[in-house]
Amino acid sequence: MSLHDIFSQELGISKDEAFIMHWTMLAWFWLHWGQYASTVTKKDIGELTGVVQLFYNNPGVQLVWNNSPFAKPALEDDFVNFVEEIITPQNTSN
């Protein structure tokens, strides 16, 4: 079973929708990584922390975050650790 088949089945969406969702989530992850990498002030970190709390706790986002070989494995460890420390433990077991 392909990754997009898994996403499709888990989320109740078509395989085409799963493909689009997967790559859209990756674009957001990379955007957030860029924001993290360019943080300068505590306000920057606070803003990004709020985004991560809301965005990464969505079940579809969690599914991609935890299963895509282009998400956590492709991002810098500092950013992955930053996200992992923020998201709620009950959602990290996907």
Task: Give the role of each language-model region.
Residues 1-94:
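Amphipathic alpha-helical "stem/stalk" segments
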